[in-house]
Amino acid sequence: LKYIFVSHMESDECGGLSVFFKEYPDMTVICSALCARELPGFGYQGKILVGSPGTFYSDKAIHMQFFDYPSEVHLQSGLLCYEKNSGIFYSADLMLRFGNGSGKTIKRAWKQEIEAIDITRIANDEKLKKLQGELLEISPALIAVGHGFCVECEK
C-alpha cells in the first residue's frame, strides 16, 4: 500500500490510519491542507502529501486531480479526487448511498450524479455550483463513495 486518500477530517474517514500505518509504515496519506495540519494532533506520524484543489499529482502509476470539497455543514476544506488512469472518482460523502453496498454497484449517468448534489451536501450555493461545473469536465468510469453503493458511470 503506497497511498491512502483522506477526503476530510472525520473519524469515519481517517480513524483507522494507525492500523494501516503500523502495517505499511512507508505509506503516504493524501489529504487537504486542513487535514494535514490536524492529523499529527491525532498521533499520525507518517508521510503526508497535501493535495490542493485545482492541482494534480502524478507518479508512475497514478495521475490524480483534486477538487475542493467544502464538506458537511461546517464547509471545512475537504478534498475530492479523480484518478485518471483508473477512471475512479473518490467522492467522500458527496455522493453517498445508504444501505450495505459491500460487493455491489449501481449504474447511473455521471451527469445525473452531479445534478443530484444539492444544498444538503454543500451548504453554500456558490460553492455548490462551482463544484458542479468543475465535475462536469471529467468523465469517471466509477464513483468510489465514502458510504454505501459505488456507482458505475453510464455514458
Feature map (PLM): residue ranges:
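Short, basic, glycine/proline-bearing loop/turn elements
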Residues: K2-I4, A61-M64, Q112-I119
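Hydrophobic/aromatic beta-strand patches that form the interior of the parallel beta-sheet core
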Residues: F5, I30, Q65-F67, F89, ...
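Short amphipathic alpha-helical segments
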Residues: L17-V19, F42-G43, G103
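Short acidic, glycine/proline-enriched helix-loop-strand junctions
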Residues: P25-M27, E152-K155
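Metallo-beta-lactamase
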Residues: M27-C153
